[in-house]
């Protein structure tokens, strides 16, 4: 296959990679790439976004050098065109600031209190978080020059804070002269209250507005705090105007937060990325990684057994490993399925009597597609809403035993509209890898609310 004379250079590379990566990775990152022009000196490719370019070069640069033409420096001679804007972006290695020998005196106040365990190299990737990790790595390499702000949202314990701190570590190590601050929303509010009390609000404003990178965790705690929201929004706008990078995390997408339209619009300026519930294979990888850190040898079959029963979030998986490690060491017990079952019986989810509901489907779809639940039930034709509404109907027909008439009534539509939506989505997922992945994320989120249905 690799020596087929009828295959172009790019096709040979694609055929080679297809046998060496997962089906999901191939469909999400390689399949969407289109060849615009190919010659013996250069290949011009169309990509859906800049993160596909980063993923391709970060993971397959060595393989690319074996197939595609090379430039004078020995790098793949590729030129990328982002599909959305049709603007050529010649391949250039990101210019990383050279590490300074020491941090200057004026920057010592900006030293970070980051979790040393939260780095990119120990963040376990899977279909549910591959895009958001690539996005975070992309903005860390080029702060203020990619998507700004980066808004990361997802449920509890899925890795949002890990990625936030990973950005901080990466920028601190590669851009040592940049001023960085990582803070929770509650800490920001407390900081503001303190400076108001001692009448030094200008000092606080000067501090935040002199930053090069602001990392804010749990922005949802800004809800229903209008005065604090206004000050945060002013700081936010100032930094964006100065091309300073901002990364924000939340448990909900911007449109679902009870914040002013002004700040929601600012949050949606850049890139909104969702961290989904990890699938089975990713949970197994997380378990094995955590076990290795604890010095616990966990066989594959045991890892799969645990992952099949503990699937809410990463923190629960880590808790399972901690408990198993302690039990095996204290009682000198071997790690068997019986040991796991006895030790983790409180963590294992009891069979749920709850069925999948239209509301749980709407909640999941709204989160993944970044739309409002009320829009899914209405007739809005705003961006992303019609497709998201069809996906919700498709999932309802797939996961709920109700009649098409009943499902249609839940959406305020007729049964024929539901049927049309289902047929449309079925056709699209055959060709659209991104949509297929989004639907998979929706199902994973729904499974957390209605686990028994997915057993």
Swiss-Prot record:
The keyword Cytoplasm applies. GO terms for cellular component: cytoplasm; plasma membrane. This is Chromosomal replication initiator protein DnaA 2. One of its GO terms (molecular function) is lipid binding. It comes from the Bacteria. Residues 113-328 are annotated as: Domain III, AAA+ region. NCBIfam families: DnaA. It is found in: Cytoplasm. Residues 96-112 are annotated as: Domain II. Its main location: cytoplasm. Oligomerizes as a right-handed, spiral filament on DNA at oriC. Disulfide bonds: none annotated. One of its GO terms (biological process) is DNA replication. Keywords: ATP-binding, Cytoplasm, DNA replication, DNA-binding, Lipid-binding, Nucleotide-binding. ATP binds at residues 157, 159-161. The keyword Transmembrane helix does not apply. Domain I is involved in oligomerization and binding regulators, domain II is flexibile and of varying length in different bacteria, domain III forms the AAA+ region, while domain IV binds dsDNA. It comes from Chlamydia trachomatis serovar D (strain ATCC VR-885 / DSM 19411 / UW-3/Cx). SMART domains: AAA, Bac_DnaA_C. Residues 1-95 are annotated as: Domain I, interacts with DnaA modulators. Belongs to the DnaA family. Induction: In infected human Hep-2 cells, transcripts are visible from 11-48 hours post-infection. The lineage of its organism: Bacteria, Pseudomonadati, Chlamydiota, Chlamydiia, Chlamydiales. InterPro entries: AAA+_ATPase, Chromosome_initiator_DnaA, Chromosome_initiator_DnaA-like, Chromosome_initiator_DnaA_CS, DnaA_C, DnaA_dom, DnaA_N_dom, DnaA_N_sf. Transmembrane segments: none annotated. Residues 329-455 are annotated as: Domain IV, binds dsDNA. Plays an essential role in the initiation and regulation of chromosomal replication. ATP-DnaA binds to the origin of replication (oriC) to initiate formation of the DNA replication initiation complex once per cell cycle. Binds the DnaA box (a 9 base pair repeat at the origin) and separates the double-stranded (ds)DNA. Forms a right-handed helical filament on oriC DNA; dsDNA binds to the exterior of the filament while single-stranded (ss)DNA is stabiized in the filament's interior.
